[in-house]
Amino acid sequence: EPGQRWQWLIEHWQPYAVQTDQGQDQGLLTGYFEPELQLRRARDDAHQVPLYALPHGWQSGQRWHTRQVMDSDPALQQALADKVIAWAADPIEALVLQIQGSGRATITEPDGSQRRVRLAFAGHNGHPYRSIGRWLLDQGETRDGSWDGITAWVRAHPQRLQSLLWVNPRVVFFREEPLAPQAADIGPRGAQGVPLTPRRSVAVDPNSVPYGTALWLQTEGVALSGARMVVAQDTGGAIVGAVRAYFFTGWGQAAKDTEYQLKQRMRWWALLPRTVPLDQPTSTKGTGDG
């Protein structure tokens, strides 16, 4: 029963307020999800956007070619030909997949058969992520930097789509994994190495919040409201500091809608067993700006 669970929680776990080094206890909560794509194994007139596995010569932590170079260098494209997992029709959908880090796909093979897969994060080209929505806002091109606003801008300026995509130099590489029916309710593996749970898993800065930490999250907004227990199981390139998180919303249309709306203030408390002593029990501080 909910009352019994709450009683067990307060009897066995001690909350410690999480703060930045500057003493700030409020930060930003955004979301991420697993997008769903329809892909083709073979390139055709409608499917022209490649999704790559790790390329030859790639090394973690080293910078590789930018998105613009990969899109415009014929010799490099030829060298990458055997690393194309599948082809997408919509460049924006492909970019969303890369930003989210993983996704689910139905791949149509050349013989017409279809394969259900997960495209799991394998690595990236070492360049920093740059938001195309923020760039459009900074350039005065739009007043709406959301994905709906970006899509509307692209429809109005299709001839400028490629240059917009090149604003973000980062390219994410994937690993194809079979997605059996019995695994349909299991999330992708996060940085901790365990499958993510919708609305319970969060991505954090592991330098501030260790993986596996249970946290009591409080937030109020249109997309998410109230308090709940979450677990730090993943990370993201834009997450810096102790009071900053991505909330895993899951997969499907409802998860997508929540992710697109989720940008609000948050506070949270690290939940530690009452039997664990702490030298400084007042707060858990990180290194970021919150």
Task: For the regions a language model picked out, list residue spans one by one.
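Solvent-exposed, well-ordered loop and adjacent helix/strand elements within mature globular domains
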Residues: 1-290
